[in-house]
Amino acid sequence: KRLFARMAEVFAGFLSYTDAQIGRILDFLEESGELDNTIIVVISDNGASGEGGPNGSVNETKFFNGYIDTAEEGLKFLDRLGGPQTYNHYPIGWAMAFNTPYKLFKRYASHEGGIADTAIISWPDGISAHGEVRDNYVNVCDITPTVYDLLDITPPATVRGIAQKPLDGVSFKVALENPTAPTGKETQFYTMLGTRGIWHKGWFANTVHAATPAGWSHFDADRWELFHIEADRSQCHDLAAEYPDKLEELKALRDEVKALKRQTATGQAGALAGGAVDGIVVARVDGLD
């Protein structure tokens, strides 16, 4: 208990230090008179990490080499945690707690604990709404289109004669001014190390595939869950048995996008089966099978 509490305390210190550095940037912008004229976006890349293992670690690189630290090892470094002699990481239990009320943690693209993050956006001169909360579903791939939209910039089709790939994502500029305005985003896919998630119009289908050979089986054997995540953000009520058609609808979206990407990769231009799917985001679909 003493070790685990100290590991969380060190992480809290890191967060406080990071917050102070962001404060230095804001102070400079304020002193230079540019704070109100600067678009600021603050996000993190995933939920809290479980890479400390069950006992935490004094050196996170051990985890990536398959070595699980013991509590006894951690206690030897208790007074050095957070210093230059350690690269410590809190235990996996803290990851679960830090992500409350969401399930699981970083690496799980199938659950909100792995993919849900807070986002803070500020631009006093360009956004009339101040200090308000938005509940619109957005993804990190929507940030760049939104910034372009705020600045009335159209991304170039070519750069120095080289054709550019179209941006993934959908601008949510309208939601910054009007919380009830639709952004046009309808679908988002997630995948990481066998875990997969499909968000579509307030519903979320997910499954977990074992990341290591010990638990491998055919992908067709994976058990899918279904949540009405717009009303059940904690993914507590699996509705797969109650709404099997809805589950298959979401899985079909993924299959259609995979087919389209294969056509694109082989130079075969073609529409999605059954016609185009509006508002779909193809980001991070590679490697789903």
Q: What kind of region is each of these model predictions?
A:
Residues K1-F4, G53, I143, Y148, ...:
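Long, internal low-complexity/basic segments
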Residues K1-T18, L29-N37:
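Anion-binding catalytic surfaces of enzymes that hydrolyze or transfer phosphate/sulfate esters
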Residues R2-F11, I127-E132, Q235-C236:
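Glycine- and acidic
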Residues R6, V10-G13, Y17-R24, A97, ...:
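Extracytoplasmic/secreted proteins, especially bacterial periplasmic and envelope-associated proteins
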Residues L15-T18, I22-I25, L29, T38-G47, ...:
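Beta-strand elements within well-structured catalytic alpha/beta cores of enzymes
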Residues F28-W123:
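Histidine-centered active-site microenvironments of extracellular/periplasmic hydrolases
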Residues E34-I40, T183-K185, H200-W203, K246:
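Loop/turn elements at helix/coil->beta-strand transitions in domains of secreted/extracellular proteins
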Residues P84-G113, G126-N136, V140-E225, I229, ...:
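C-terminal cap/loop subdomain of S1 sulfatases and analogous C-terminal strand-loop tails that border
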